[in-house]
Amino acid sequence: MANIKSAKKRVKQTVVRNERNTAQRSMLRTAVKKVIKALSIKDIAGAETAFAVAQPILDRFSSRGLIHKNKAARHKSRLTARIKALKTA
């Protein structure tokens, strides 16, 4: 356990940030899963609306450093490709 006052404060900050990041990462995963679920049942409209919700979440969290920018780009690219493939099929 920390003895110095500033170290105690840092421990508190770490706990708060960890909880916030965990919740936000969970929200991100849920948004992506909704798109994938809509794609699996071949619901084009549902997939597009879910993707419209997930895309800004990916952008926001990548700019904050919660996920890497390449991971966000990869998710967006792959989901877009799957939606496009479903439309043409």
From Swiss-Prot:
InterPro entries, alphabetized: Ribosomal_bS20, Ribosomal_bS20_sf
**Cellular compartments per GO CC:** cytosol; small ribosomal subunit
Which SUPFAM superfamilies has this protein been placed in? Ribosomal protein S20
- Keyword presence, Cell cycle: no
Query: What's any GO biological process attached to this entry?
Result: translation
In this chain, composition skew of type Basic residues spans 1-12
Keyword rRNA-binding assigned to the entry: answer is: yes
Highest taxon of the lineage:
Bacteria
Task: Give the function comment from the record.
Answer: Binds directly to 16S ribosomal RNA.
NCBIfam families according to UniProt: S20
Q: Which family does it belong to?
A: Belongs to the bacterial ribosomal protein bS20 family.
**Stated name of the protein:** Small ribosomal subunit protein bS20
Q: List the gene name.
A: rpsT
